């Protein structure tokens, strides 16, 4: 649905926008693992506490700081919101990203600080890449 909206509104420019979105999500994901999780090595609550009850049977990887889900969805929401420049779209994407991020705590696989870190990292990456996009206007 989002891809359709981008193609419909941006036409020929949409291929570059989709590449930029992929770059943001890729940088958010790789950075959350290689810059944060492997550096801080903070165990997820489901690996640290024996009495954490998981909604699903999977706990995820060993380390949880920062949440890759949170960084990816916030990076996506910010970059799409900035490029498309539509307030209602940004609000909808921001609410969606917040629900996804909250679900990680609800599922018992992240601490709230993991989510906050992911939100900040995703926002940072998206804003840096957006500033480069605006500067070089692909």
Predicted features by range, described:
Residues 7, 56-138:
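Membrane-embedded catalytic cores of phosphoryl/pyrophosphoryl-handling enzymes
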